[in-house]
Amino acid sequence: MYVQERVSLMTILKKIRILDFSHVYYGPYATMIMADLGAEVIKVEPVWGEVAREYDPKFGGVSQVFHYLDRNKRGVTLNLKDPKGKKIALELASKSDVVIENFSRGAMDRLGLGYEDIKKVKPDIIYASLSGFGLDGPYAKRPSFASIASSMSGWYRLTGDLVDPEGPPVMPAEWHGDLDPGLYAVIGMMGALLHREWTGEGQHIDVSQLDCMIAQNGIPITGYLMSGMLPYEHRQKRTGLRFMGPFEASNGWVFIHTSPRMTERLMKGMGVEKLESRANLENWTAERTVKEVVDALIAVGVPAAPINSLKEVVEDPHVNHRGMIVSVEHPDAGTVRSPNHPIKYSRVKPEMRSAAPLLGQHNEEVLTDLGYSAEEIEGLREAKIIT
């Protein structure tokens, strides 16, 4: 009975409507999270479709990026440069709680869809502008991608320093310069929604990729500002963490994370009385399988884990017990399996309600909700204002 009740409870953002003009990773990741939490997200694409549909590899003619980031959304197409398309966008905005965009600076203003324009039809709108460098400052008009923010924030240099301070910068897996700022955009939208609940006021949210990635590097930056020393210089002064990092086992790799206080536990797990160098630990792991190393160390309270491939991740029994892989049916791609929303709530349940939309899939129902007749909708299609 409890499980049935839990599933039937309304989701956190069920009454929130988001008009989503964003594209690629940055904005769509933020709105995906909001949609997972129950918000109605109306994704607005150009009549030819947003560029992220076209990235390889494709499944059912649509990229893996779009399948993942645009699930749980309703999809409409609009030619925003046409006055009738702009009119529809303003009508949708007037019935929305949040507008989000990540166009180049000034693009929405030129279309007549900037914050001040939307405020005229929805005074308490929350308007989230996502960009590389923010709405002001010397770099505000520069183009940006995730890699640019990660480079300028020190992220790539810090990662390279972990390998070799004298070597090249290292680009980590995945686009954290998009995904991390996307999470900050979620925080910003949720905070603004709460502020509006208290005060009745909407506001303009300015989310900069560079600002967010600097915040993500907050600890090493704080250390540098207080000491004048870079993180690798601090590490060179310490010896207690020499037993932390990736180690090769006989059939793969493990990551062992110790602190100076764990050395005795580490020796106990290894079954040795002396541990004089990193080479001793490397030799020990090399003679054992990944499972043997991990089992021996976690038995004595030393954090250790296999360094998994994606195949091993999705087959991991704990991952599946936690419900982290979910499925949804797509009309062209078939079954789409992807990671679930990661947060578990005791009273609500984020849901995989629908696959990413086909191009213009919800044009008719969204326009009908606005009061457009079937004849008017067909006229918009013939005029190429919608698909």
Predicted features, each with a name:
Residues 2-17, 242, 246-249, 257, ...:
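Terminal low-complexity tails and localization/encapsulation signals of metabolic enzymes
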Residues 296-319:
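Conserved PLP cofactor-binding pocket of PLP-dependent enzymes
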Residues 151-295, 304, 323-333:
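Acidic, glycine-rich segments within the central catalytic cores of soluble metabolic enzymes
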Residues 2-198, 291, 358, 364-387:
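N-terminal helix-loop segment corresponding to the beta1-alpha1 unit
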Residues 101-102, 275-276, 346:
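Short beta-strands and strand-loop turn motifs
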Residues 59-62, 238-240, 336:
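Short solvent-exposed loop/turn micro-motifs enriched in small/polar/acidic residues
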